[in-house]
Amino acid sequence: MFQWIYESFGNDYGFLRVFSYVTLRAMMAGLTSMFITFIFGKSLISFLLSLKFRESVRNDGPQSHANKSGTPTMGGLIMILSLTISTLLWGNLSNWNVILLLISAILFAGLGFTDDYMKSVKKIKGGMRARTKFIVTILFAVTITTLYFYYTGKSNVNLQKGIVFSITDLFLPFVKGPVWNLGIFAVPFAIIVLIGSSHAVNLTDGLDGLASGTVVISTATFALIAYVSGTPSAANYLHIPYLPGSHEYSVFLAGLSGALLGFLWFNCHPAQVFMGDTGSLFLGSTLGLVAIMLKKEILLVILGGIFVAEAVSVILQVGSFKLTGKRIFKMAPLHHHFELSGWSEEKVVIRFWIIGIILAIITLSTLKIQ
Protein backbone atom coordinates (compact mmCIF):
# COMPACT_ATOMS: atom_id res chain seq x y z
CA MET A 1 0.00 0.00 0.00
CA PHE A 2 2.74 2.46 0.95
CA GLN A 3 4.58 1.72 -2.29
CA TRP A 4 1.40 2.61 -4.18
CA ILE A 5 1.03 5.81 -2.15
CA TYR A 6 4.56 6.82 -3.15
CA GLU A 7 3.97 6.03 -6.82
CA SER A 8 0.68 7.97 -6.82
CA PHE A 9 1.64 11.04 -4.79
CA GLY A 10 5.44 11.00 -4.59
CA ASN A 11 5.88 13.80 -7.12
CA ASP A 12 3.69 16.13 -5.06
CA TYR A 13 4.95 15.15 -1.63
CA GLY A 14 8.69 14.59 -1.53
CA PHE A 15 8.70 13.03 1.93
CA LEU A 16 6.84 10.02 0.50
CA ARG A 17 10.03 9.07 -1.32
CA VAL A 18 11.05 7.18 1.80
CA PHE A 19 8.52 4.49 0.87
CA SER A 20 10.40 3.74 -2.35
CA TYR A 21 13.29 2.24 -0.40
CA VAL A 22 13.07 -1.54 -0.21
CA THR A 23 15.28 -1.69 2.88
CA LEU A 24 12.94 0.57 4.85
CA ARG A 25 9.83 -1.30 3.75
CA ALA A 26 11.48 -4.62 4.60
CA MET A 27 12.33 -3.45 8.11
CA MET A 28 8.86 -2.04 8.61
CA ALA A 29 7.26 -5.25 7.30
CA GLY A 30 9.26 -7.26 9.81
CA LEU A 31 8.37 -4.97 12.70
CA THR A 32 4.71 -4.81 11.69
CA SER A 33 4.22 -8.58 11.55
CA MET A 34 6.23 -9.11 14.73
CA PHE A 35 4.20 -6.59 16.74
CA ILE A 36 0.91 -7.93 15.39
CA THR A 37 1.94 -11.38 16.59
CA PHE A 38 3.09 -10.00 19.95
CA ILE A 39 -0.06 -7.98 20.54
CA PHE A 40 -2.65 -10.51 19.40
CA GLY A 41 -0.79 -13.75 20.14
CA LYS A 42 -2.13 -14.19 23.66
CA SER A 43 -5.68 -13.41 22.57
CA LEU A 44 -5.39 -15.98 19.80
CA ILE A 45 -4.20 -18.60 22.28
CA SER A 46 -7.25 -17.95 24.47
CA PHE A 47 -9.49 -18.06 21.39
CA LEU A 48 -8.02 -21.39 20.26
CA LEU A 49 -8.50 -22.82 23.75
CA SER A 50 -12.13 -21.69 23.81
CA LEU A 51 -12.75 -23.48 20.52
CA LYS A 52 -10.96 -26.59 21.84
CA PHE A 53 -8.32 -26.48 19.11
CA ARG A 54 -5.94 -28.59 21.18
CA GLU A 55 -3.00 -30.80 20.27
CA SER A 56 -3.20 -34.56 20.77
CA VAL A 57 0.17 -36.11 21.58
CA ARG A 58 1.05 -39.48 20.01
CA ASN A 59 1.19 -42.32 22.53
CA ASP A 60 4.42 -43.81 21.18
CA GLY A 61 6.36 -40.55 21.48
CA PRO A 62 8.89 -39.56 24.16
CA GLN A 63 7.42 -39.64 27.67
CA SER A 64 8.50 -36.03 28.22
CA HIS A 65 5.89 -34.98 25.66
CA ALA A 66 2.94 -36.24 27.70
CA ASN A 67 2.41 -32.83 29.31
CA LYS A 68 2.08 -31.21 25.87
CA SER A 69 -1.34 -32.76 25.33
CA GLY A 70 -4.02 -30.09 25.38
CA THR A 71 -1.74 -27.28 24.22
CA PRO A 72 -3.60 -25.13 21.67
CA THR A 73 -2.64 -25.69 18.06
CA MET A 74 -3.26 -23.86 14.75
CA GLY A 75 -0.95 -21.06 15.89
CA GLY A 76 0.02 -20.71 12.25
CA LEU A 77 -3.13 -18.59 11.91
CA ILE A 78 -1.52 -15.61 13.64
CA MET A 79 1.54 -15.92 11.41
CA ILE A 80 -0.39 -16.01 8.15
CA LEU A 81 -2.56 -13.12 9.36
CA SER A 82 0.37 -10.90 10.34
CA LEU A 83 2.25 -11.84 7.15
CA THR A 84 -0.75 -10.92 5.00
CA ILE A 85 -1.22 -7.55 6.71
CA SER A 86 2.49 -6.63 6.56
CA THR A 87 2.71 -7.63 2.89
CA LEU A 88 -0.38 -5.62 1.94
CA LEU A 89 0.97 -2.60 3.81
CA TRP A 90 4.64 -2.66 2.81
CA GLY A 91 4.95 -4.96 -0.20
CA ASN A 92 5.01 -3.90 -3.83
CA LEU A 93 1.66 -5.26 -4.96
CA SER A 94 2.45 -4.54 -8.59
CA ASN A 95 5.10 -7.28 -8.41
CA TRP A 96 3.31 -10.45 -9.52
CA ASN A 97 5.70 -12.81 -7.74
CA VAL A 98 5.07 -11.09 -4.40
CA ILE A 99 1.35 -11.68 -4.89
CA LEU A 100 2.04 -15.29 -5.86
CA LEU A 101 4.09 -15.82 -2.70
CA LEU A 102 1.21 -14.55 -0.61
CA ILE A 103 -1.39 -16.62 -2.48
CA SER A 104 0.74 -19.74 -2.07
CA ALA A 105 1.15 -19.12 1.65
CA ILE A 106 -2.60 -18.67 2.15
CA LEU A 107 -3.44 -21.81 0.14
CA PHE A 108 -1.07 -24.06 2.08
CA ALA A 109 -2.10 -22.49 5.39
CA GLY A 110 -5.69 -23.30 4.45
CA LEU A 111 -4.77 -26.90 3.71
CA GLY A 112 -2.96 -27.18 7.03
CA PHE A 113 -5.89 -25.58 8.86
CA THR A 114 -8.28 -28.14 7.39
CA ASP A 115 -6.02 -30.96 8.53
CA ASP A 116 -5.61 -29.47 12.02
CA TYR A 117 -9.37 -28.91 12.33
CA MET A 118 -10.13 -32.52 11.47
CA LYS A 119 -7.59 -33.75 14.02
CA SER A 120 -8.28 -31.44 16.94
CA VAL A 121 -12.00 -30.69 16.59
CA LYS A 122 -13.51 -33.55 14.63
CA LYS A 123 -11.17 -35.96 16.45
CA ILE A 124 -10.38 -37.82 13.24
CA LYS A 125 -7.18 -39.72 13.89
CA GLY A 126 -4.47 -38.51 11.55
CA GLY A 127 -6.65 -35.72 10.19
CA MET A 128 -7.18 -35.64 6.44
CA ARG A 129 -6.67 -38.89 4.58
CA ALA A 130 -3.05 -39.03 3.46
CA ARG A 131 -4.08 -39.62 -0.14
CA THR A 132 -6.46 -36.65 -0.18
CA LYS A 133 -3.91 -34.38 1.46
CA PHE A 134 -1.22 -35.41 -1.02
CA ILE A 135 -3.49 -34.86 -4.03
CA VAL A 136 -4.47 -31.38 -2.82
CA THR A 137 -0.80 -30.58 -2.18
CA ILE A 138 0.07 -31.62 -5.74
CA LEU A 139 -2.78 -29.54 -7.18
CA PHE A 140 -1.61 -26.47 -5.27
CA ALA A 141 2.02 -27.04 -6.28
CA VAL A 142 1.15 -27.55 -9.96
CA THR A 143 -1.01 -24.42 -10.03
CA ILE A 144 1.55 -22.21 -8.29
CA THR A 145 4.59 -23.34 -10.27
CA THR A 146 2.72 -23.17 -13.58
CA LEU A 147 1.61 -19.62 -12.83
CA TYR A 148 5.16 -18.67 -11.88
CA PHE A 149 6.73 -19.97 -15.08
CA TYR A 150 3.94 -18.57 -17.23
CA TYR A 151 3.99 -15.02 -15.86
CA THR A 152 7.72 -14.72 -15.25
CA GLY A 153 8.46 -15.18 -18.94
CA LYS A 154 11.04 -17.12 -20.87
CA SER A 155 14.22 -15.44 -19.69
CA ASN A 156 15.90 -13.00 -17.38
CA VAL A 157 18.87 -10.88 -18.34
CA ASN A 158 21.91 -9.97 -16.30
CA LEU A 159 22.01 -6.34 -17.39
CA GLN A 160 25.54 -5.81 -16.12
CA LYS A 161 27.23 -8.60 -18.06
CA GLY A 162 24.71 -9.09 -20.85
CA ILE A 163 24.30 -12.74 -19.86
CA VAL A 164 20.96 -14.20 -20.85
CA PHE A 165 19.71 -17.18 -18.87
CA SER A 166 16.43 -19.01 -18.95
CA ILE A 167 14.23 -19.42 -15.89
CA THR A 168 14.41 -23.14 -16.64
CA ASP A 169 18.18 -23.13 -16.03
CA LEU A 170 19.59 -24.93 -13.01
CA PHE A 171 22.28 -23.30 -10.87
CA LEU A 172 24.61 -25.07 -8.43
CA PRO A 173 26.31 -23.66 -5.32
CA PHE A 174 29.96 -22.61 -5.83
CA VAL A 175 29.52 -22.78 -9.63
CA LYS A 176 29.35 -19.61 -11.73
CA GLY A 177 26.54 -19.57 -14.25
CA PRO A 178 23.88 -22.18 -15.06
CA VAL A 179 24.96 -25.81 -15.38
CA TRP A 180 21.94 -27.31 -17.12
CA ASN A 181 18.73 -26.24 -18.80
CA LEU A 182 15.89 -28.32 -17.43
CA GLY A 183 13.58 -27.43 -20.30
CA ILE A 184 10.22 -29.17 -20.00
CA PHE A 185 11.37 -30.77 -16.74
CA ALA A 186 11.60 -27.38 -15.01
CA VAL A 187 7.98 -27.42 -13.85
CA PRO A 188 8.03 -31.02 -12.50
CA PHE A 189 11.32 -30.22 -10.75
CA ALA A 190 9.82 -27.10 -9.19
CA ILE A 191 6.78 -29.09 -8.04
CA ILE A 192 9.06 -31.60 -6.30
CA VAL A 193 10.97 -28.77 -4.60
CA LEU A 194 7.75 -27.14 -3.40
CA ILE A 195 6.17 -30.33 -2.08
CA GLY A 196 9.41 -31.66 -0.61
CA SER A 197 10.13 -28.43 1.23
CA SER A 198 6.59 -28.23 2.57
CA HIS A 199 6.63 -31.73 4.02
CA ALA A 200 10.21 -31.46 5.31
CA VAL A 201 9.33 -28.46 7.49
CA ASN A 202 6.15 -30.24 8.56
CA LEU A 203 8.25 -33.16 9.84
CA THR A 204 10.59 -30.76 11.67
CA ASP A 205 7.74 -29.28 13.68
CA GLY A 206 7.92 -31.66 16.63
CA LEU A 207 9.63 -29.76 19.45
CA ASP A 208 8.95 -26.40 21.08
CA GLY A 209 10.51 -23.70 18.93
CA LEU A 210 12.34 -26.09 16.60
CA ALA A 211 10.53 -25.36 13.33
CA SER A 212 9.89 -21.67 14.00
CA GLY A 213 13.52 -21.05 15.00
CA THR A 214 15.11 -22.92 12.12
CA VAL A 215 12.71 -21.50 9.53
CA VAL A 216 13.35 -17.89 10.61
CA ILE A 217 17.06 -18.47 10.01
CA SER A 218 16.26 -19.61 6.48
CA THR A 219 13.79 -16.81 5.71
CA ALA A 220 16.20 -14.13 6.94
CA THR A 221 18.97 -15.63 4.80
CA PHE A 222 16.76 -15.76 1.73
CA ALA A 223 15.72 -12.14 2.38
CA LEU A 224 19.38 -11.09 2.04
CA ILE A 225 19.83 -13.19 -1.09
CA ALA A 226 16.64 -11.78 -2.61
CA TYR A 227 17.81 -8.23 -2.00
CA VAL A 228 21.24 -8.65 -3.63
CA SER A 229 19.75 -10.69 -6.50
CA GLY A 230 17.43 -7.80 -7.34
CA THR A 231 20.12 -5.12 -7.06
CA PRO A 232 22.15 -4.86 -10.31
CA SER A 233 25.37 -3.61 -8.71
CA ALA A 234 25.31 -6.26 -5.98
CA ALA A 235 24.44 -9.07 -8.40
CA ASN A 236 27.23 -7.94 -10.71
CA TYR A 237 29.76 -7.80 -7.87
CA LEU A 238 28.83 -11.27 -6.62
CA HIS A 239 28.51 -12.74 -10.14
CA ILE A 240 25.07 -14.11 -9.38
CA PRO A 241 21.98 -13.98 -11.63
CA TYR A 242 20.37 -10.55 -11.62
CA LEU A 243 16.64 -11.12 -11.12
CA PRO A 244 14.69 -7.91 -11.76
CA GLY A 245 12.17 -7.26 -9.00
CA SER A 246 13.45 -10.01 -6.71
CA HIS A 247 14.56 -7.46 -4.11
CA GLU A 248 10.84 -7.00 -3.41
CA TYR A 249 10.74 -10.59 -2.12
CA SER A 250 12.88 -9.39 0.78
CA VAL A 251 9.94 -7.30 2.02
CA PHE A 252 7.71 -10.38 2.05
CA LEU A 253 10.43 -12.49 3.68
CA ALA A 254 11.15 -9.83 6.30
CA GLY A 255 7.46 -9.83 7.14
CA LEU A 256 7.54 -13.60 7.48
CA SER A 257 10.68 -13.44 9.63
CA GLY A 258 8.99 -10.94 11.94
CA ALA A 259 5.91 -13.15 12.20
CA LEU A 260 8.11 -16.12 13.09
CA LEU A 261 10.00 -14.19 15.77
CA GLY A 262 6.74 -13.01 17.27
CA PHE A 263 5.36 -16.55 17.22
CA LEU A 264 8.57 -17.92 18.76
CA TRP A 265 7.86 -15.76 21.80
CA PHE A 266 4.89 -18.01 22.55
CA ASN A 267 6.26 -21.21 20.98
CA CYS A 268 9.56 -21.49 22.87
CA HIS A 269 9.77 -24.11 25.63
CA PRO A 270 7.40 -24.66 27.32
CA ALA A 271 5.21 -23.82 24.34
CA GLN A 272 1.97 -21.93 24.92
CA VAL A 273 0.84 -22.72 21.38
CA PHE A 274 1.85 -24.95 18.47
CA MET A 275 1.83 -23.79 14.86
CA GLY A 276 0.23 -27.03 13.65
CA ASP A 277 0.05 -27.97 9.99
CA THR A 278 -1.54 -24.54 9.51
CA GLY A 279 1.90 -23.06 10.01
CA SER A 280 4.37 -25.74 8.98
CA LEU A 281 2.88 -26.45 5.55
CA PHE A 282 2.82 -22.82 4.45
CA LEU A 283 6.28 -22.14 5.89
CA GLY A 284 7.81 -25.06 4.04
CA SER A 285 6.07 -24.31 0.76
CA THR A 286 7.14 -20.67 1.00
CA LEU A 287 10.79 -21.65 1.39
CA GLY A 288 10.47 -23.91 -1.64
CA LEU A 289 8.78 -21.26 -3.79
CA VAL A 290 11.32 -18.59 -2.84
CA ALA A 291 14.15 -20.99 -3.73
CA ILE A 292 12.54 -21.54 -7.13
CA MET A 293 12.11 -17.81 -7.76
CA LEU A 294 15.70 -17.03 -6.74
CA LYS A 295 17.15 -19.95 -8.76
CA LYS A 296 18.47 -21.40 -5.51
CA GLU A 297 16.68 -24.75 -5.52
CA ILE A 298 19.84 -26.77 -4.88
CA LEU A 299 21.16 -24.22 -2.40
CA LEU A 300 18.01 -24.84 -0.35
CA VAL A 301 19.41 -28.28 0.43
CA ILE A 302 22.29 -26.57 2.23
CA LEU A 303 20.32 -23.75 3.84
CA GLY A 304 17.53 -26.12 4.87
CA GLY A 305 19.89 -28.90 5.88
CA ILE A 306 17.99 -29.43 9.13
CA PHE A 307 14.75 -30.00 7.23
CA VAL A 308 16.49 -32.32 4.77
CA ALA A 309 17.98 -34.37 7.62
CA GLU A 310 14.59 -34.67 9.31
CA ALA A 311 12.90 -35.83 6.10
CA VAL A 312 15.69 -38.25 5.17
CA SER A 313 15.60 -39.78 8.66
CA VAL A 314 11.91 -40.62 8.20
CA ILE A 315 12.50 -42.07 4.72
CA LEU A 316 15.40 -44.21 5.95
CA GLN A 317 13.50 -45.35 9.03
CA VAL A 318 10.42 -46.41 7.08
CA GLY A 319 12.46 -48.00 4.28
CA SER A 320 14.70 -49.93 6.66
CA PHE A 321 11.77 -51.24 8.70
CA LYS A 322 9.88 -52.39 5.61
CA LEU A 323 12.92 -54.08 4.06
CA THR A 324 14.66 -55.55 7.11
CA GLY A 325 12.22 -55.21 9.99
CA LYS A 326 14.84 -53.14 11.84
CA ARG A 327 14.95 -49.45 12.68
CA ILE A 328 17.99 -47.25 12.06
CA PHE A 329 17.01 -44.59 14.58
CA LYS A 330 15.46 -44.93 18.02
CA MET A 331 12.63 -42.85 16.64
CA ALA A 332 12.02 -40.66 13.61
CA PRO A 333 12.06 -37.78 12.76
CA LEU A 334 15.65 -37.21 13.81
CA HIS A 335 14.95 -34.82 16.70
CA HIS A 336 13.12 -37.58 18.56
CA HIS A 337 16.14 -39.88 18.15
CA PHE A 338 18.28 -37.39 20.05
CA GLU A 339 15.62 -36.99 22.72
CA LEU A 340 15.56 -40.75 23.30
CA SER A 341 19.37 -40.69 23.36
CA GLY A 342 19.26 -38.54 26.48
CA TRP A 343 19.28 -35.00 25.12
CA SER A 344 16.80 -32.61 26.70
CA GLU A 345 14.27 -30.96 24.41
CA GLU A 346 15.90 -27.57 24.92
CA LYS A 347 19.33 -28.96 24.03
CA VAL A 348 18.06 -30.54 20.81
CA VAL A 349 16.36 -27.32 19.74
CA ILE A 350 19.26 -24.99 20.51
CA ARG A 351 21.81 -27.28 18.86
CA PHE A 352 19.64 -27.53 15.76
CA TRP A 353 19.41 -23.72 15.74
CA ILE A 354 23.20 -23.51 15.92
CA ILE A 355 23.53 -25.91 13.00
CA GLY A 356 20.96 -23.84 11.11
CA ILE A 357 23.02 -20.68 11.65
CA ILE A 358 26.17 -22.45 10.44
CA LEU A 359 24.34 -23.64 7.33
CA ALA A 360 23.08 -20.09 6.73
CA ILE A 361 26.66 -18.77 6.86
CA ILE A 362 27.77 -21.46 4.40
CA THR A 363 24.83 -20.54 2.17
CA LEU A 364 25.79 -16.86 2.11
CA SER A 365 29.42 -17.76 1.40
CA THR A 366 28.36 -19.50 -1.82
CA LEU A 367 27.35 -16.12 -3.23
CA LYS A 368 30.99 -15.06 -3.43
CA ILE A 369 32.90 -18.35 -3.55
CA GLN A 370 32.32 -19.61 -7.07
UniProtKB/Swiss-Prot annotation:
Catalytic activity: UDP-N-acetyl-alpha-D-muramoyl-L-alanyl-gamma-D-glutamyl-meso-2,6-diaminopimeloyl-D-alanyl-D-alanine + di-trans,octa-cis-undecaprenyl phosphate = di-trans,octa-cis-undecaprenyl diphospho-N-acetyl-alpha-D-muramoyl-L-alanyl-D-glutamyl-meso-2,6-diaminopimeloyl-D-alanyl-D-alanine + UMP
Enzyme class, UniProt record, top EC level: transferase
Any one GO biological process: regulation of cell shape
Transmembrane residue ranges: 29-49, 70-90, 93-113, 133-153, 177-197, 209-229, 251-271, 273-293, 298-318, 349-369
UniProt KW keywords: Cell cycle, Cell division, Cell inner membrane, Cell membrane, Cell shape, Cell wall biogenesis/degradation, Magnesium, Membrane, Metal-binding, Peptidoglycan synthesis, Transferase, Transmembrane, Transmembrane helix
InterPro entries: Glycosyl_transferase_4, PNAcMuramoyl-5peptid_Trfase, PNAcMuramoyl-5peptid_Trfase_CS
Protein name: Phospho-N-acetylmuramoyl-pentapeptide-transferase
Organism the protein comes from: Leptospira biflexa serovar Patoc (strain Patoc 1 / ATCC 23582 / Paris)
Gene from which this protein is expressed: mraY
